Amino acid sequence: MTRVLAVANQKGGVAKTTTVASLGAAMVELGKRVLLVDLDPQGCLTFSLGQDPDKLTVSVHEVLLGDVEPDMALVETSEGMTLLPANIDLAGAEAMLLMRAGREYALKRALAKVSGAAPAATSGTGAAPAATSGTGAAPAATSGTGAAPAATSGTEPFDVVIIDCPPSLGVLTLNGLTAADDVIVPLQCETLAHRGVGQFLRTITDVQQITNADLSLLGALPTLYDSRTTHSRDVLLDVADRYNLPVLAPPIPRTVRFAEASASGSSVLAGRKNKGAMAYRELAGALLEYWKSGKALATFAPDV
């Protein structure tokens, strides 16, 4: 069964995109078929994985509006992940979706049509149609599980879909949360970084009550963590206490490798064994085990 994970926080600069790319790459290393969905009009995930957002012929924009089938927009990354890319056109899609009934379900409907076939295009110039064995993509059942991309004849479904939500509480983020089985909230370990967390958690509660009753909040993921400072530890203690929110382990340490990876068009895992990459690998393995057996995710208790 395909698992759909949303990575979301209304605040920018908290390593959402890095988390999506790194978890995806780590799961590919573990033999999983992974689809990444870029829901940010800035196209940061798309750019960080070596695609040029300005040269895309089709993207998630057309997919959400129903103008093209999802398979038409998929591209393959150099690290074996499949990407549904985004560019600035997506900002226009957000405005158009606001005028449509059922706008929160646009992504869920689209993911139900994804065939799981390997996309043909690997360059940054747009996506060629993926093979669907001439049968089209049969929508999968979505009862109680978010949007599960279905397999067509001769293809296999994705094991995991990871959604990079934009830094806002608008209709695109609502689409990501409505389509997801689970959500992780990346949280930079600084005092100002957790301002607005309460509002975001209320949004998750609204989604659970209105559009996705099965959405599970897994917890906050500490990012840009510096174990040498008491400030980072104090922030995590405050978040856990104030919001009664699990703080996931391991924390993602601050490392210059994150910026270097984005500039090179690859994930932080590509050819590297730095502490950040190892932390994401550990979290990816824990998530897969949680989805397989229900084993609880480890939580982080800062030493004080």
Predicted regions and their residues:
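P-loop NTP-binding core
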Residues: 1-304
